[in-house]
Structure formats: C-alpha cells, structure tokens
C-alpha cells in the first residue's frame, strides 16, 4: 500500500477530530440530565434552567472553554422520534398572497384561476405555478396579468412593480419575487415567535420554493398551544358590535326560516331561557317556543347579553356558520345589518343546567360594511406585553403609534357616546368586547382581557410583538411524539445496535479468524468516524437513522468480505501471502467489484436523500456517510493491520477450521435451473399483480392523507369496540389496529383532515378523549390525554397529520425516487460494463425484487401482527433494497466479466456457471450479515420501524435469489449467439 504513513496520519487525525466532535454531545447530554434532575418533571422549569446557563462555561479543554449554548450547537441532535416534541410543515397560503397583491381583485378570470389552481394542482407542483397555468388557460390571451384590475394596481406600481405595458411573462417574474418576499416575511415572523416560545434548539427552515416552512420544536409538549402559536396570522382588528336587542329580530326571523328546512319532528330539546328566547316569548306565534321546534335557538346553551348573542357548544359552530352563510338567511338582514359579520369568541367553560362543566363559545355580530373593513386595523400596535387587569386577572396591554392613538380615541369616543362595545378581534376570534364607560381613551394604550391564563397572555403578547403573517399559515403535516416514546425508541435502537455489532463481529471472527479481527477493528473505527461526521455536520439522529447505522455495520464488512474472498482464491492458486494481498486490493482483484457495488449503492442513497424528508432524510444521511466511512476503513484501516501482520512474519490464511472447506469446489448448475426459476418468478409476479389489483396496498397517511394516533391504554382493549365508538363521531372514518402490545392501538382517520386551522385539530382530539376516556380510570384529564410529559404511559403517545396536498406531493416524490434510482443505476452499469445486457439483467432483477416485496405487502397486510403500510419509510426500504440487490448482482457480474475476458475454458454457459459458483462465498456472506442485522432490528428495533425493516429483510433475501437466478440468466439469454461463439472460440484457443 503506497503512502502508508500518510494514511496512518490522516486516520489518527480523523479519529482525534471525531472524538473532539463527539465530546460536545457527551457534555451536552450530561448538562441536560442535570437539568432534568433539577426540574423533577417540570418541563418549563427545565427549559428555564437550560436558558439560565446558556452563557455559562460548561466545557473546559484546557486551551479553550465552551458555553452550554456553544456545546449544544456542536452536539448530535436527536430527532423528534427520539427526543419527543412536535414537527409541523406550515403551508403559507400563496392564494391569500395573490389576493392581497391584486387588492382583492374581482376579475372573474383571476378568481376562477385561483379556484382552478386549488382544484387542479398536481403533485409536487407549487400553487403559484398551478395558478399561472390556470390563468393562461382561462384568459387565452384575452386578459393580461398586468390589467389594472389585477396586478397593475396602485399598490404594485412604481419601481420594481407592475405597469400596464408588461407581458404576462414579465409579470410572472415580479409576482414570483413578491410571493418569495412574503414567504420570507412569514419565515421571519415565525422565527420571532419561536425564539420567544422557550424550547431548546428549535429548528425552522423553508422547504424549497413551495411556500412551505418546516418547524421542529424538540421537547415541546403542549400540542394545542403550539399549533395556535404557529397558525395565528396575528390579524388584529377592532370592530364595533351590535347589541343583542339590535340583532334579535334577525335571529328570530332566521330561526323561523330555518324551521322550514332544518326541523326534525323527532327532535325534542328544552328551550333555554335567555334574552333571545324572551324575545320569542313575546312573539305572536307562540308555537315557536315549543320544545325542539327551534333549529337555531335550541342550540343556545346559556344566555348572552350586551354584544353577546348567546353561548353555544363548540361542536355546533360549524352548523351555525353554515346557517348564516345561506343566501335565504342573509336576505333577512335589513339595512346596514346586511353587512353584519358573525364571529365567535374564545372557548370557555361554564356550568350547564345540571351543574356539569361544559365548553361554550360566545357569538358576536360585528358592524360590517361594504368593503368588510374594520373600524381600526391592528397594524398600529407597536408593542404588546402580558400583564394583569384591574381585577388581577391575566391580560395583554398594547401600545399604538401616533395615528393609531388618534383613531383609537375617535373609536372609543363614539362607543362611549353610543353606549356600544368594541370587539378586539384576532384572526376572526373575539378575545374581548369591552364597553367604554369613562369617555374617549387617549394615549393609544389599550388592553385585551378575558378568560385567560398566564400562558395564554404570554403567547398572545408574543404573537402581537412578532407581527402578523402576510397570509394564512395552515398545518398541512404534523407529527407529535411524547418523550417517553422517544426514550423507548432510543432503548430499542441502542439494544439492536449493540446486538448487531456483536453478532457481525462474532461471525467475522468465526469465518475469517485473525483477518476477521482486523475487519472488526476497522468496523469500530468506522463507527467512530460515522458519529464524528454526524456531529461535525450538525446532523439530526432519528430512529430510521439508527437503523441506517445498524445497516452500516452489516455493509461495513462487505468490502472486507470481497477482499478476503479474493485473497483466499489467490492463495489457493499458489500465490504468496504478499502477492495475494496485493492482487486482492488491486483493481483486477476486488476493487472493481467494490467500486461498482458501492457506486450503485451511493446513487440510490442520494436519490433517497433528495426525495426523502424528515426521518427518511436522516436514514439516507447515515447510510451515505456509512458507505463512505466503511469504504475507507475496510480498504485502508484493515489493510494497515494486515500489512503489520505480514511484516511480523505471522501467518494469515483468511479461514478457520469451521470455514476452511465451505463453498470450496462448489459446483451448481445455476443456468440449468433457469426454466424453473423463470417459471417461479413469473408465477410470483402474476400473483403479486393479481393481489395488487384485488387487495391493493395499505396506503399510509403519507400517501392518502389523514390523521394517525398511537394511543396506549391501561389494559388490553378490543379494536372492534373502539372502532365502533369512533366511527359514530368520525363520520365512519376510523381504522383501528393493535400496535405492538395489546393495550396499544394505532387509530387512523380522515375526519376533517382537509379543514385548515386549529379548530379541526382540537375537535378531533376532544372527540377522541370524550369517546375513549371511559376505557381509562377516573382522573385522566384532556390535557394529560393529549399533551406530552415526561413519564407519560397512557393516552396519545404519538400523533401525526398529513394533508391531502402534501400526501400527493409525497406520493409523486416516491414514484420519481424509485423510477429515478432504477434509471440512474441502469445507465451507470451500462457505462461501467459497456454492454446493455448487464444493465438489463440487473434492472430486471431489481424490478422482480420490488414487485415481490409489493406482492408480499399486498397479500399479508390484513393479517400480519405488525404494520405494513406503504409510506415514506416503505419507499426508503425499497430504495435500500434496490441498492443491496444491485450490490449482490454486481459481485456476480464482475466475476462473469472477469472470467469471460480471462482464460477459463468451457462453453459460454459453463464459464458463466463457474463465475457464479466462485462468488458464492462472497454472495452468501454479504447477504447473511445484512439479513442477521435486519433480523435483529426487526425483533428489537421497535414497533414503529418493524414494517420498514420487514420490507428490507424480504428484499435482501429475494435480492440474493434474483442476483443468482434472474439477473445472470437474463444476461446470458440476451447476449447474441455471435458474441457467445466469439467468447467460446477465444477460450478454446487459450
């Protein structure tokens, strides 16, 4: 080996750098454990402790010191599946941005294009591109984007803006830039909010130019609070309100009109005695007061007063909103009331007639106008602080600028004179609607009070200070993981990694003896380098990432196996140990096979990295780094010890008594079996396609959208019971499966997954709690059921949501990833082997493997005791199978190419058969180490990745079969008769 000293120098330097980088992870972990001990389960106390020592020196290397914040920045970060917390993807509404840029244009072509873009957006297409396509189709050249009533409006004119003379292509560039600026503005606002929220090491990043923003909050536990914080647009407005006596006649008339379409004769409900029902009591038609005869009024659960029209149950708000949007109801509003805007207040808890605590929400009617503009906008607010009102209750005080102070004085003066109320509205929710009893308020200071707690006022002040979002931000994908579940994942991953390392190391020693020890040392160094690189690049370690590390231990010895097997062959051919080592490490020896196998593997890993997201990207990261470090340690580190052994004149045989005669003089007619293997594989493909057509696949929420909950109970529970209970409240959409132990369920539903905003999320959580709490002992509250906390054992341990548009993007990415990986590998092999027949054989084998795995999943998902969903994890498994199947195939093909170009005697089929037989030890050993580590991961890796590992396990097994019985026979059958005769003539002459 040339430059041995230089390699040793770099290896030692790399090892020292890796240890240095990993030291930060150990120090950070120790400090965090101290914080947990100090907080004793209080997450807020834990965060405050870590914040307080952020600038303190916690790591002294003698020549330099590091603060806790610096140490945290350099550690290996754990993903949410290991740390716990919440991960969301927010979709900034490009539709709202375009409306704003057009000044809410009424142009029919423009608005139809907005609607068409929403309906027809293709997977992986941005909304803006979909809008441009729709506008081109709808306008057909008759309407320009630079029209005065679209984008050539006053607000977009001027330098860098839109003028009337511009073409659509020019306007598109400007609008694209303006949209990017708005998303950037949203990104900045969200970062300000998150920085003040109080979690350690939050992560926020834009996802390409899709208008999507990824937010990760490790360790965050209050789910509903976080979603409110992220989704609030902070659109603060001040509206004048109607009083109940002013709007009461409309409510009466609406109730009468609704009776014609909504009343059910079997419905019997008591009429609540509130101010509205009192109005009704004076009506001439006393029949209206009969129980169950009031579609609108029967839904009132408590009386209102002043600006509050009544209190309703949150579950009825959607129905009532639908009533007020109906044209036949709106027409009942007289005069200026026709512009009235009906909005809800914040949810509070009240006592019903039986004294039971129930949720209630207040209904308000705001004094609207033709342009739907509030009396005052919240843009005048310059500062906001959480404080306490005169009664000592939590509130938020606001300070306005000069213009705002003047407008506020006018507005409060008018309210004082008219004895009316001013509603303080944030994102179409009324937080308070105070009256003005002491005259106009000067100075621009105001206060928001209501049924708040201290946490709510802190968040509200935070949102107002950070500023408003330029458009609505909807959570299109989310995942919530409890810290206890994360600890279980760490334990499972650690156990499987240790056991996998032990088994692989033991096998290498049993099979290769002393040389196996050298491979094991290289494996240990490989793991050090791998973790060192992960720490240095700031990678996030996820559970699939741990699986990638365990797989790396299987692949790390592959190169050693190929080299050792070649060395054994050279020794059997009578060469000296030095000659055998030199040959096996040469391009003519093992290097060509190692290069081709790993390049194909790297290509599929790169595709996985590009198209994957979240944990899957973490898997791809560890896999790619592991391939590179494995190559370095297998080729150079193990070689250093081998050369050291040779220099000491020690014997090295690469075999033990156990393995000495295994696969020696192995002769099997692989090509003679091709008729049977073709028949078997054709039957498998037919069965797979038949099952796919009849049974389909169990597509996960990643591909079809939906909500998934992992819920643990105190004792075993029947899935059918839970399914029947939830189907009643989720409109028939509830799939319930046992997940791991029989007291843990995986519940999937599409109920309201398309509805934006946090209200739908909260409704689903509350419906889950209300319908499942009967299966728990008394004392389980909604907060304990939904939110995460240290030591949580029951309730929702993990929850995820994937919106339908994101699901379509993921599915599109998955198709392109698989097809792209196969195309790239086909091209590489064709270039490397210079014959398309090699590529065809390899791709046919890979396609066979993919179809086989899909067929198994289609046939078995209904009765297997673990999840077999087709999701991002499954696609990662398929791409990994493609890589490893190629690995096996390349080992065989490389020997075939060598023998066909060499002097081996025999017919074409005999030469190819001999090629396959001489690679059996390599093929079986490389596959066996992979199968062993996958089995370990399958048994000990945890329920959440069992289906993912199973796909790889089946794929590796069938991939080994296809390399021997599909790829090579196809290669032989597609080579022309003339080429075969040329080879046979050459070998006879040799």
What are the residue ranges of the model-derived segments?
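Interfacial helix-loop-helix hairpins and adjacent transmembrane helices
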Residues: 1-72, 76, 99-108, 114-136, ...
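Interfacial segments of transmembrane alpha-helices in multi-pass membrane proteins
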Residues: 3-4, 396-397, 401-418, 422-423, ...
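Hydrophobic alpha-helical transmembrane segments of membrane transport and translocation systems
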Residues: 8, 525, 532-533, 569-585, ...
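Small-residue-enriched core segments of transmembrane alpha-helices in multipass membrane transport
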Residues: 12-15, 424, 516-538, 549-556, ...
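Non-transmembrane, solvent-exposed regions of membrane trafficking/translocation machinery
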Residues: 22-31, 51, 55-63, 71-435, ...
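Pore- and gate-forming transmembrane helices of large, multi-pass membrane proteins
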Residues: 190, 484-504, 523, 573-613, ...
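Juxtamembrane "pre-transmembrane" interface segments
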Residues: 216, 444-447, 455-503, 767, ...
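Short helical (or helix-break) motifs at transmembrane helix termini and adjacent helical loops
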Residues: 552-573, 594, 631-636, 879-903, ...
């Amino acid at each position: 080996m040339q430059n041995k000293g230089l390699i040793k120098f770099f290896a030692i330097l790399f090892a020292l750098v890796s240890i240095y980088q990993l030291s930060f992870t150990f120090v950070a972990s120790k400090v965090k454990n101290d914080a947990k001990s100090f907080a004793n389960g209080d997450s807020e106390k834990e965060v405050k402790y870590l914040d307080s020592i952020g600038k303190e020196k916690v790591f002294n290397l003698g020549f330099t010191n590091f603060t806790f914040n610096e140490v945290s920045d350099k550690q290996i970060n754990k993903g949410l599946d290991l740390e716990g917390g919440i991960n969301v993807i927010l979709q900034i509404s490009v539709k709202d941005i375009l409306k704003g840029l057009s000044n809410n244009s009424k142009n029919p072509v423009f608005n139809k294009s907005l609607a068409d873009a929403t309906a027809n957006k293709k997977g992986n297409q941005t909304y803006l591109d979909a809008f441009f396509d729709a506008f081109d189709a709808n306008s057909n050249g008759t309407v320009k984007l630079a029209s005065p009533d679209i984008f050539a409006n006053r607000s977009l004119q001027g330098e860098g803006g839109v003028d009337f003379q511009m073409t659509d292509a020019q306007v598109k560039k400007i609008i694209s830039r303006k949209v990017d600026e708005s998303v950037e503005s949203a990104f900045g606002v969200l970062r300000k909010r998150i920085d003040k929220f109080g979690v350690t090491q939050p992560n926020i990043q834009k996802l390409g130019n899709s208008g999507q923003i990824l937010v990760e909050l490790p360790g965050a536990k209050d789910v509903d609070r976080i979603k409110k914080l992220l989704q609030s647009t902070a659109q603060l407005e001040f509206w004048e309100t109607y009083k109940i006596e002013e709007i009461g006649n409309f409510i009466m008339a609406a109730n009468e009109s609704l009776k014609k379409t909504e009343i059910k004769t079997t419905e019997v409900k008591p009429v609540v005695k509130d101010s509205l029902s009192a109005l009704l009591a004076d009506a001439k038609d006393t029949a209206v007061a009969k129980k169950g005869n009031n579609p609108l009024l029967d839904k009132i659960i408590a009386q209102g007063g002043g600006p509050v029209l009544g209190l309703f149950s949150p579950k009825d708000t959607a129905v009532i909103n639908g009533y007020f949007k109906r044209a036949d109801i709106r027409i009942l509003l007289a005069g200026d009331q026709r512009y009235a805007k009906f909005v809800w207040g914040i949810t509070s808890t009240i006592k019903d007639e039986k004294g039971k605590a129930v949720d209630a929400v207040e209904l308000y009617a705001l004094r609207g106008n033709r342009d739907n503009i509030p009396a005052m906008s919240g843009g005048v607010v310059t500062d906001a602080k959480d404080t306490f009102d005169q009664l000592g209750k939590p509130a938020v005080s606001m300070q306005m600028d000069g213009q705002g102070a003047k407008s506020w004085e006018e507005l409060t003066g008018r309210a004082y004179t008219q004895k009316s109320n001013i509603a303080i509205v944030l994102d179409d929710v009324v937080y308070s609607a105070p009256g003005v009893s002491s005259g106009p308020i000067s100075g621009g200071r105001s206060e928001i009070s209501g049924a708040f707690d201290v946490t709510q006022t802190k968040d509200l002040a935070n949102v107002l200070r950070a500023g408003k979002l330029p458009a609505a931000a909807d959570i299109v994908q989310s995942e919530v993981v409890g810290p206890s579940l994360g600890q279980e994942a760490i334990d499972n991953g650690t156990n499987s990694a240790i056991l996998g390392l032990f088994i692989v190391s033991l096998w290498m020693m049993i099979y290769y003896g002393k040389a196996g020890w050298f491979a094991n040392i290289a494996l240990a160094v490989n793991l050090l380098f791998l973790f060192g690189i992960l720490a240095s690049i700031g990678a996030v370690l996820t559970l699939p990432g741990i699986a990638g590390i365990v797989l790396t231990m299987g692949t790390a010895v592959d190169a050693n196996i190929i080299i050792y097997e070649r060395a054994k062959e050279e020794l059997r051919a009578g060469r000296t140990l030095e000659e055998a080592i030199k040959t096996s490490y040469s391009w003519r020896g093992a290097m060509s096979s190692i290069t081709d196998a790993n390049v194909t593997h790297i290509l599929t890993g790169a595709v996985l990295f590009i198209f994957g997201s979240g944990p899957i990207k973490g898997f791809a990261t560890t896999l790619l780094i592991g391939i590179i470090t494995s190559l370095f340690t297998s080729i150079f580190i193990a070689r250093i010890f081998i050369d050291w052994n040779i220099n000491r004149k020690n014997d090295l045989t690469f075999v033990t008594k156990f393995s000495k005669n295994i696969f020696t003089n192995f002769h099997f007619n692989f090509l003679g079996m091709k008729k049977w293997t073709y028949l078997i594989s054709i039957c498998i493909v037919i069965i797979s396609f038949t099952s796919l057509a009849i049974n389909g696949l169990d597509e996960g929420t990643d591909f079809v959208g939906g909500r998934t909950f992992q819920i643990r109970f105190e004792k075993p529970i029947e899935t059918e019971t839970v399914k029947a209970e939830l189907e009643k409240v989720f409109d028939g959409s509830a799939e319930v499966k046992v997940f791991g132990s029989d007291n843990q369920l995986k519940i999937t539903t599409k109920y309201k997954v398309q509805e934006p905003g946090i209200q739908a999320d909260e409704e689903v959580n509350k419906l889950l709690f209300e319908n499942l709490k009967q299966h728990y002992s008394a004392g389980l509250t909604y907060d304990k059921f939904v939110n995460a906390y240290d030591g949580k054992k029951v309730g929702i341990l993990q929850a995820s949501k994937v919106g339908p548009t994101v699901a379509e993007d993921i599915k599109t990415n998955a198709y392109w990833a698989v097809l792209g990986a196969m195309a790239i590998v086909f091209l590489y092999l064709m270039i490397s082997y210079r014959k398309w027949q090699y590529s065809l054989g390899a791709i046919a084998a890979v396609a066979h493997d993919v179809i086989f795995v899909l067929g198994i999943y289609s046939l078995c998902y209904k009765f297997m005791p673990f999840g077999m969903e087709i999701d991002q994890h499954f696609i990662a498994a398929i791409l990994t199978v493609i890589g490893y199947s190629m690995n096996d195939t390349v080992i065989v093909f490389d020997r075939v190419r060598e023998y066909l170009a060499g002097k081996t005697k025999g017919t074409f089929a005999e030469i190819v058969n001999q090629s396959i037989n001489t690679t059996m030890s390599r093929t079986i050993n490389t596959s066996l180490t992979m199968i062993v580590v996958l089995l370990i991961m399958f048994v000990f890796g945890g329920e959440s990745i069992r289906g993912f590992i199973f796909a790889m396990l089946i794929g590796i097994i069938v991939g080994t079969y296809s390399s021997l019985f599909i790829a090579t026979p196809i290669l032989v059958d597609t080579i022309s008769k003339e080429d075969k005769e040329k080879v046979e003539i050459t070998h006879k002459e040799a």
